[in-house]
Amino acid sequence: MVRLRTGAVNTMSKRLILSVDPGKASGICLFEYEKGYEPKLIWSGEYQQNEYAQPIRNAFVSYVQYGMPIDIVCERFTINAQTVRNSQAPYSLEQIGILKQIMLDHKIDPDTIIFQSPADAKAMFSNEKLKKLGFWHKGGEGHALDAIRHAVLRLAKIGWIPTKLLD
């Protein structure tokens, strides 16, 4: 089970950010954010197809348990000439479908998923910047880092200023 930090929770100002980089191997992470404070990376990981749904379900358990608003961010998957040739192409679409079903199971409209382009996330938050921010995931093939990238891009879009990058 995903556990958030202990203590009283002010559900009016705190929110969760669940971020997914879907694919054959998927990156998933969960952040907690309160305006005026640094975001906290609760967990991150890389998951194979048979493992993919459980961490998402766990994040939704935390969402229900703590009553915090949740933003669900997902890398946009666009079918183009390259992805048609790529044998892994259907995996991303299938994983997005699983994410949408889990949202429906928790009475969350899947149309509220915030899709972001991989190029935007990588342009804004390089590996060097993720390290400087302290949001580095060790191990894996980089999918967890891509999920983290999408989460911090979302955080920046809702008002978080990554001041550690200004030093």
Where are these regions (language model features)?
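Phosphate- and other anionic-substrate recognition elements at nucleic-acid/protein interfaces
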Residues: 2-167
